[in-house]
Amino acid sequence: MAPVQLENHQLVPPGGGGGGSGGPPSAPAPPPPGAAVAAAAAAAASPGYRLSTLIEFLLHRAYSELMVLTDLLPRKSDVERKIEIVQFASRTRQLFVRLLALVKWANNAGKVEKCAMISSFLDQQAILFVDTADRLASLARDALVHARLPSFAIPYAIDVLTTGSYPRLPTCIRDKIIPPDPITKIEKQATLHQLNQILRHRLVTTDLPPQLANLTVANGRVKFRVEGEFEATLTVMGDDPDVPWRLLKLEILVEDKETGDGRALVHSMQISFIHQLVQSRLFADEKPLQDMYNCLHSFCLSLQLEVLHSQTLMLIRERWGDLVQVERYHAGKCLSLSVWNQQVLGRKTGTASVHKVTIKIDENDVSKPLQIFHDPPLPASDSKLVERAMKIDHLSIEKLLIDSVHARAHQKLQELKAILRGFNANENSSIETALPALVVPILEPCGNSECLHIFVDLHSGMFQLMLYGLDQATLDDMEKSVNDDMKRIIPWIQQLKFWLGQQRCKQSIKHLPTISSETLQLSNYSTHPIGNLSKNKLFIKLTRLPQYYIVVEMLEVPNKPTQLSYKYYFMSVNAADREDSPAMALLLQQFKENIQDLVFRTKTGKQTRTNAKRKLSDDPCPVESKKTKRAGEMCAFNKVLAHFVAMCDTNMPFVGLRLELSNLEIPHQGVQVEGDGFSHAIRLLKIPPCKGITEETQKALDRSLLDCTFRLQGRNNRTWVAELVFANCPLNGTSTREQGPSRHVYLTYENLLSEPVGGRKVVEMFLNDWNSIARLYECVLEFARSLPDIPAHLNIFSEVRVYNYRKLILCYGTTKGSSISIQWNSIHQKFHISLGTVGPNSGCSNCHNTILHQLQEMFNKTPNVVQLLQVLFDTQAPLNAINKLPTVPMLGLTQRTNTAYQCFSILPQSSTHIRLAFRNMYCIDIYCRSRGVVAIRDGAYSLFDNSKLVEGFYPAPGLKTFLNMFVDSNQDARRRSVNEDDNPPSPIGGDMMDSLISQLQPPPQQQPFPKQPGTSGAYPLTSPPTSYHSTVNQSPSMMHTQSPGNLHAASSPSGALRAPSPASFVPTPPPSSHGISIGPGASFASPHGTLDPSSPYTMVSPSGRAGNWPGSPQVSGPSPAARMPGMSPANPSLHSPVPDASHSPRAGTSSQTMPTNMPPPRKLPQRSWAASIPTILTHSALNILLLPSPTPGLVPGLAGSYLCSPLERFLGSVIMRRHLQRIIQQETLQLINSNEPGVIMFKTDALKCRVALSPKTNQTLQLKVTPENAGQWKPDELQVLEKFFETRVAGPPFKANTLIAFTKLLGAPTHILRDCVHIMKLELFPDQATQLKWNVQFCLTIPPSAPPIAPPGTPAVVLKSKMLFFLQLTQKTSVPPQEPVSIIVPIIYDMASGTTQQADIPRQQNSSVAAPMMVSNILKRFAEMNPPRQGECTIFAAVRDLMANLTLPPGGRP
């Protein structure tokens, strides 16, 4: 940047200015007030300040002055403080005004500077031109007046121009510049050849030392090379014999490859000096070549000795340490080293042998190389080792020392071998020469890894021992003993022999389930025969049989120091009382020496002994030769011991199992050999009878059992397999493996490591499994006997997939895609049922998972497979429909927006009774009946007394009317009219006689299924005319007293996992907590997972149920249905029960007297408890009732996106009507009494409203509006208001806060409400406003994307002196892959001024402000352009203008 000019065009100097105080310590100090004067003085010599530095100075100055003011002003008066502040402000302002002017000027400062530079450059050029002209003119007038040119050199010019050369060049110049012509290549070769002949003649006639015999003559030179010392190149300067030799090049060949790092050992200056010295000798001496050799050879020997000395020092420093010492070193004479110094090693005291190596130069004959001497002299046992130790070819002191100690180590090993041969004349040790080692076999035959390796440490000369597997402490003791006295090796080898024998035994059985130890703690060790064995023994514990041991005793073999003999014993111990107490030895028995009698062979089905088997001797591997066996390690395998262990491990489990079977008095055939002696087995002759089954079933099961055999299998022989062979299987499954005449059942039992194999637990597990087989067999036997008479629908509905005596798997359904598995659980002593899906339905959830616990309890009470199939048949379709109901908790349904309510809670009460709780307020009881029907009633009424309500539930008004809309007219059950049920007409109806006759007749006898001959209580499978509930044993959830179809007799469910009683209702936990897996088809994949897009709430955790709401209707009067005689689903009294006259509401007030021989007149149920009377629906009707479907009677465009079932729509409408009644009491609305049931009437200042369920469908809540002044409203406006209430307010998802917001709108003044209705019309019919760019939606609750004025879900309409409401605008035109842009606009309408503006609400930090700013500007411009008139509302006009003119920037989203 150019220098900055201040006032009067002065540059600011870069270094001027003092320091101010108060600014940051790291910033440069600002200029003092007088900096401008100093800047003006230094402007010519300084380039000026950078603008950034100047700005920084000004800021620091202002900051420092402000800090001074903060320190000084508190001490001054108020007037002085104000004066100081004004002065500071004025001064600072003037300063920054100047800075501003300077910055504006600085924009053009660069251009001005460039122009100035160009002008200055042009001025300098003009000055140069003028000065040059002046000088040339002066030179012409003064210096060149008398100057003359020479005559032209015409001949030279002609030569150059014609010939291109300069032949007339003077000779003196030619000789000094142009070199002479070189000799030719032929002349050069001839000269060198002649010189080579002169050199050869000279060499022949001169005395040459023999060391210089390696020479080469070439190119007029002779090259002498002495390997390892030097290389010299010489020549002569003529053919005269007296001409001296010339030394051309000298190279020293001595190298230090170990410590030299590749660098030259002789400096170039030293070589130059030697070169001069040798050249002087060549000039003066009579024998120049001899003298040259002596001089160079002497220097190279001294250099080699020096190299060896440096290597020794490095060897001592880095590797050998004190193990090698320099005894003496004379430079150029000798080097003496000592190795294997025992005193240094600290192993002995006093005099110690010292081994020396001396390297010196022979003083008598200097021409010899370095001489090596050993003290004491090396033995002559191995000439190759001695010869290597006497040479030093590679100039390596370490190699020389290693060769020396290698020869001495070989001598020590020979001495040790002689000691071993004195102990054993047949010893078979060998010496390895690569690394000095003595290999001593300990136990013949011996592998290489089992031999004792004795090495000699080359550094110290000490013996080092190695034996695989031996601990280091023992090796250290052996080394110390042998190094002190080599004869001590003998007892150590004797001890190692027994140790190696133990290791061989351990290695032989390491793959077997055993634990080996040298000692064993026994409480009676001293008194038991085990104590008399030798000390060298091994205890082998059989891990699968922890009470048994194999003891191996090892003994010496006379006259065979390298062999052992083994004796084997079998020992049993008793279990210790405590873990830390020793066991007691019981039996000790020696194995036979010849074990051929222990090898079994099966022949003709009998166990016989054979003499043809191979003989296993005591010696595990006979000695084949006297040499140590090197190939392989099979000689270490003790096959006798391995055979003993394997035999005990195989046979003893069967012995234990046989003893347990005998103790339990279970007859068996004993241990038998199978498969040519390779396996064993135990066959049971009879299995004890089972408890809990009939004698007939036990006999049938015993007759069908052909064989029961126990075998051992598995890698560790810890798995028992009991094979059961059955014949005459009562059921044949569809599996191909179940089609043969006999069935094989395999029961597997794993033995724990802590338990002996073949113990009592195996037998107990087998008996439990046999009991499970018997229990299931009894049910299967009864089921098989009933199969010929099974109803056709059950035969088509189900099939037997698998029956393997342990489990019965049935597949059922139209596609056989569901499965049920039945098996007996011996731990819980009851049947266990599991459900699943197969085939194409695999992976889906079974619909009966909801009532799995109830099915299991029912089957355990009455284990009848036919009854179970009938229940599955009757409940599959209802449960499929029930599982489609939404069970996801939702937020914002009530005024407590943070509380989640579960839409539907499925509470199974029994296998055929399912209770549905809707939002913890209404309850629906569904009873699954036979013949494809269900009975539905209001579960809020008590099952025992219809005059009482279940705590926590409320009756659903109009439920009976709603359910009768789904009644199938073709159903056999006769029904009464809806009006007759809800509003009783005359005391007796047209079909009263049928009802009276049915009451006078005695109830039909419930005949149980007749037992077939030979069966035990089996039922026939023909379907009786009445329901199956009355033909089977009653479960605890069914009362024995007769009631309408036994529908009201369900008491609180039994079992620990049942749903809670209605008297203490809480939200039921999900089925997954009961061990039931709900698949996608249950609830989460239903259409109810998609909520209304205007609702901000998704799945959340459920909370507790809501409390009682004020004003809930109560019911009174006894329920006549509780005392009805036995009824069936086909009985018409299910819909119109006849109560006792004494309990009738009209009893005692009737003036008519009935004849004594006639039943009392029929009293229709009161409407308050009419819904407690069950309504019979077919399965298809129930599916329609519970299946999500569009709202009937509504145009698809008007209906919301929340798809729900008719039952949810009805209950939701009832809840909304209940909320509306409570809201009317809280808001400023006037309630109007109405005689119509289920109708709510109220009025506002301008409207009368009537709210009731739709009479056609009972699934929507409809509003009928009547204005007080008919002239103020148009019919289409009222229709829009009514349709908006039906579709947007009281429709799904049925939120109470939408009602609160709508009632606030109804209470608004007429002109405001009319504008809101126009906005509602734009929402309901968006296609009618094609000229608008946006669609509008009236937000009755605050959406989550709205400005944070209140929690989401709260009412979005506030009506006081000003009106606040929210609109959601959605852009019409959008690219298909992208979602349409939507914005939330909070609008506030001022009733006093009549202006419509956007509410000024703080936005979230991460939200965009572009869209709200544009909306606010459009609304402000509309207010300016269209000022409101008195009594006119501008809401709709402003909103319509906003929808027409709002355009977001491209790519921008709110």
Curated annotation (Swiss-Prot):
One of its GO terms (molecular function) is transcription coregulator activity. It comes from the Eukaryota. Residues 25-34, 1001-1011 have a biased composition (Pro residues). One of its GO terms (cellular component) is nucleus. A motif (LXXLL motif 1) lies at residues 69-73. Pfam families: Med14 (PF08638), Med14_C (PF25069), RM2_Med14 (PF22981), RM3_Med14 (PF25065), RM5_Med14 (PF25067), RM6_Med14 (PF22984), RM8_Med14 (PF22983). Residues 14-23 have a biased composition (Gly residues). Changing residue 1325 to L: In a breast cancer sample; somatic mutation. It is found in: Nucleus. The modification Phosphoserine is found at residues 617, 986, 1112, 1119, 1128, 1136, 1144. Residues 1-34, 973-1167 are annotated as: Disordered. Residues 500-824 are annotated as: Interaction with SREBF1. A motif (LXXLL motif 2) lies at residues 1182-1186. Keywords: Activator, Nucleus, Phosphoprotein, Repeat, Transcription, Transcription regulation. This is Mediator of RNA polymerase II transcription subunit 14. It comes from Homo sapiens. The gene is MED14.
